[in-house]
């Protein structure tokens, strides 16, 4: 039960025929299409990065603390963590890129029920078109 928050623009919801992976198990380099809903994401349709896809995981950052910090604090952590990791993965500063970033973050329920502290950073095309190939080191 992860909630996706998208910086600047909302992603278009597209479905694809592929295998699903738990949102809790996403790893750097995983490529996937948009889930059917971004409210609370439990799984995403995984794609081969060589095939057209909507998103790619470029970082996972772990929040600390035992008490739920609130939505604003989670979003602030996600924005800072994903911004910081963007250039390391893509190879160009976010401000100079044609790519956008967003994130999957813990919900209050997942924080309490399954000890979810992971913020998953994702990259996607600013124009919401499909990407082909990994975005690692593309520098655009």
Task: Give residue spans per PLM region.
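Sec-dependent bacterial lipoprotein signal peptides
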Residues: 1-16
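Primary mode marks residue(s) on the alpha4-beta5-alpha5 output face of response regulator receiver
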Residues: 18-140
């Amino acid at each position: 039960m992860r909630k996706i928050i998208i910086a600047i623009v909302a992603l278009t919801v597209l479905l694809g025929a592929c295998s699903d992976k738990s949102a809790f198990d996403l790893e750097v380099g995983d490529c996937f299409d948009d889930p059917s809903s971004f409210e609370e994401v439990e799984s995403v349709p995984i794609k081969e990065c060589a095939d057209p896809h909507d998103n790619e995981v470029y970082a996972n950052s772990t929040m600390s603390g035992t008490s739920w910090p609130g939505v604003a604090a989670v979003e602030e952590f996600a924005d800072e963590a994903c911004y910081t990791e963007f250039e390391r993965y893509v190879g160009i500063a976010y401000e100079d890129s044609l790519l956008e970033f967003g994130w999957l973050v813990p919900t209050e329920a997942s924080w309490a029920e399954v000890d979810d502290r992971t913020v998953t950073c994702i990259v996607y095309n600013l124009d919401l078109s499909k990407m082909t190939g990994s975005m690692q080191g593309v520098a655009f």
